[in-house]
């Protein structure tokens, strides 16, 4: 204090007491713990920092720390995993499992739901139902429930038909025999009460997203990289990717992975129908595509200036359909027909993502380069994409942080935090983890290597 007189000391003591009564000291302890956990520094070191200068992941984790450590016993979390990297999601899963609070969360991250949710509440067809189990059993539980609902509705319809026919029969008999009038009135009353109670809940309609990714036969070696270096991003590495393989590109956040996909797109000699050439990517060494490899790129940011101002129907008709009905039928398979006349930029993120996948299908790409394809897809669309890739006759290289999606891949090309590129038998999500190169395989020409000096 600049002044040490008695009135000043009294005011200072009063202010401290007021701060304590308001819970200020407890708040300081809480926020110190939050800042250390989320930002790696104590509250005193960052107390004046503008929140807008934090990354999206830092902001989200700081808020989640405050909520999970705070006094509230019930938390409502809307997409709490957005902006979190995989390490952040794993931290969130652990905290959700450990907390004694009641948590209601909305999420499309299937791995998060599987690891953290004890019950799954589904809202569909204006009804709500609860699955008391892990997400990995959710799909079967939903099928079983829908089968029960369909059977109940079938029985109700049969009984409804029987009661209506009984009323008709008794009406005819009552017209000829007064003694049947009481039975007729009883049947009418019974039918009325049955209809007043109403039918059981209808089984909800399944999402009808049908991705017919076909591809085509190419040379055995689909991608060849020799001493390839992404200038200023990653150290030189070698790798070969063979026809039909599913390779996930994983690793630390930051530049490198998306550049790798754009580089593969830029060196193509043959592009699918409707695809636009990619801008050159600075690199040294060799990056080459095999015979008859025609790559299609799914852009993570959905940045497609060539589609701006055009409707999905117009886009499909330009390159892939001569008739409007053909275009709308294709859009309907991706549940896009209802927005077929909206400009591309007004579509939701999920709609733009599904349209991009449809264009890859119609273009006939034999190599799919997918940059975070499930980021904006709901659960049904993400599962439809995985089903489409299972039957796809071509090669797939995908950058992803979706752990559930990554389970379906054969190989993992890891872009490490130390600028190395190497193969791993399992996905590596920790940005600080350094892995060892995978030993070269020598079996029947189907070998695949990735090296980083």
Please give the residue ranges for each predicted region:
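Proline-centered turn/helix-capping motifs that create local helix->coil transitions or kinks
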Residues: 193-205
């Amino acid at each position: 204090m600049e002044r040490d007189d008695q009135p000043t000391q009294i005011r200072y003591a009063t202010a401290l007491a007021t701060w304590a009564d308001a819970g200020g000291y407890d708040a300081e302890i809480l926020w110190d713990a939050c800042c250390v956990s989320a930002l790696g520094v104590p509250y005193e070191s960052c107390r004046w920092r503008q929140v807008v200068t934090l990354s999206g992941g830092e902001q989200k984790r700081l808020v989640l720390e405050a909520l999970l450590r705070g006094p509230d016993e019930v938390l409502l979390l809307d997409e709490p995993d957005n902006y979190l990297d995989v390490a952040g999601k794993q931290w969130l899963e652990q905290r959700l499992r450990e907390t004694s609070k009641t948590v209601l969360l909305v999420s499309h991250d299937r791995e998060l739901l599987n690891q953290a949710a004890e019950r799954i509440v589904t809202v569909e067809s204006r009804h709500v139902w609860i699955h008391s189990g892990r997400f990995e059993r959710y799909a079967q539980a939903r099928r079983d429930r829908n089968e029960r609902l369909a059977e109940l509705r079938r029985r109700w319809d049969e009984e409804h038909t029987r009661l209506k026919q009984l009323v008709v029969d008794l009406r005819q008999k009552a017209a000829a025999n007064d003694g049947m009038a009481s039975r007729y009135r009883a049947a009418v009353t019974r039918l009325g009460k049955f209809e007043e109670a109403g039918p059981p809940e209808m089984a909800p309609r399944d999402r009808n997203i049908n991705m017919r990714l076909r591809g085509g036969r190419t040379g055995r070696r689909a991608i060849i990289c020799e001493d390839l270096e992404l200038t200023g991003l990653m150290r030189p590495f070698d790798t070969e990717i063979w026809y039909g393989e599913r390779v996930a590109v994983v690793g630390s956040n930051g530049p490198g992975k998306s550049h790798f996909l754009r580089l593969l797109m830029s060196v193509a000699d043959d592009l699918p129908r409707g695809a636009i050439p990619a801008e050159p990517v600075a690199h040294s060494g060799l990056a080459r595509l095999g015979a008859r490899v025609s790559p299609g790129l799914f852009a993570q940011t959905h940045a497609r200036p060539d589609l701006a101002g055009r409707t999905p129907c117009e886009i499909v008709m330009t390159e892939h359909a001569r008739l409007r009905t053909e275009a709308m039928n294709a859009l309907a398979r991706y549940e896009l027909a209802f927005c077929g006349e909206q400009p591309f930029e007004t579509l939701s993120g999920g709609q733009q993502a599904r349209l991009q996948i449809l264009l890859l299908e119609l273009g006939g790409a034999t190599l799919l380069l997918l940059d975070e394809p499930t980021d904006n897809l709901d659960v049904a669309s993400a599962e439809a994409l995985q089903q489409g890739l299972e039957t796809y006759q071509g090669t797939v290289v995908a950058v992803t942080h979706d752990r559930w999606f990554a389970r379906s891949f054969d190989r993992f090309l890891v872009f490490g935090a130390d600028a190395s590129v190497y193969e791993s038998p399992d996905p590596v999500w920790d940005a600080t983890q350094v892995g060892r190169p995978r030993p070269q395989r020598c079996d029947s020409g189907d070998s695949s290597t990735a090296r980083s000096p």
